[in-house]
Regions:
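Short gly/ser/thr-rich secondary-structure transition/capping motifs
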Residues: 16-24, 92-94, 148-150
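A generic structural signal for well-ordered alpha-helical segments
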Residues: 13-14, 75, 103, 135
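Non-catalytic C-terminal accessory region of glycerolipid acyltransferases
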Residues: 30, 93-198
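Short acidic-hydrophobic, aromatic-tinged amphipathic segments that line or gate anion-handling sites
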Residues: 23, 81-84, 175
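Short, solvent-exposed loop/turn elements at beta->coil junctions and helix N-caps
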Residues: 26-28
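Catalytic core of membrane glycerolipid acyltransferases/transacylases, capturing the structured
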Residues: 1-7, 15-16, 31-88
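A generic structural signal for alpha->beta connector loops
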Residues: 18-20, 56, 77, 107, ...
Length: 198
């Protein structure tokens, strides 16, 4: 389901928006090891298309997104893990164990958006600490990804044509760093790349 939707998204972007999709840094993709993906988030594009770049990654998302017609069904279909953000609830008590179990029993990587919501192309909000908590609990490599999709498919306003979306796969961040150090490196690497892509 995820790959089909990702391929359809790529087709629509290429042929209806006359937009080129470039993937750079494929040599940095982690192979034969458990890892999770931390990607910048400017549009709905990456929610769908990254399913085709990586091996059908699993999303962590706000529980209310599952209530959106059709989109919520899609998120459930691809095995997303939902959480009530900023709350400690019974539903969230097994959060990290659910993720660890998923990573252990599957070849599918986890994907998170450290900005926590879609942002405009020139916005640079601080990354949320939830990203470092996942890094600390899972104790696996992080694959950073920078995507400048907001110029084509912005969170507000109409879509643009004759543009280029670049998906930049950055060098992995090894496990074992302190939480604050990891978050600082992740944020710096992704924003430096986005500044370059601009």
């Amino acid at each position: 389901g995820g790959r089909i939707m990702g391929n359809w998204t790529g087709f629509c972007v290429k042929y209806f928006l006359s937009t080129k999709i470039i993937i750079k840094g494929t040599e940095n993709i982690i192979k034969n090891k458990k890892f999770f993906i931390a990607a910048s988030h400017q549009s709905m594009f990456e929610t769908f298309y990254l399913q085709t770049v990586f091996n059908s990654p699993v999303f962590i998302l706000k529980k209310e997104l599952l209530l959106i017609p059709i989109f919520g069904w899609y998120l459930k279909k691809i095995g997303s893990i939902s959480i009530k953000r900023d709350k400690t609830t019974k539903d969230n008590l097994s959060f990290y164990s659910d993720i660890s179990k998923l990573i252990s029993n599957s070849n599918r990587p986890l994907i998170i958006f450290p900005q926590a919501t879609r942002v405009l192309p020139n916005e640079r909000p601080k990354f949320k600490k939830g990203a470092s908590k996942i890094y600390d609990n899972l104790k696996i490599i992080c694959q950073p990804v920078a995507i400048n999709s907001g110029y084509v498919w912005p969170k507000k306003g109409k879509k643009n044509i004759n543009k280029t979306i670049t998906i930049s796969i950055l060098k992995p961040i090894e496990a074992g760093l302190q939480n604050d150090e990891f978050l600082k490196i992740l944020e710096k690497n992704i924003y430096t790349e986005l500044d370059f892509l601009n």
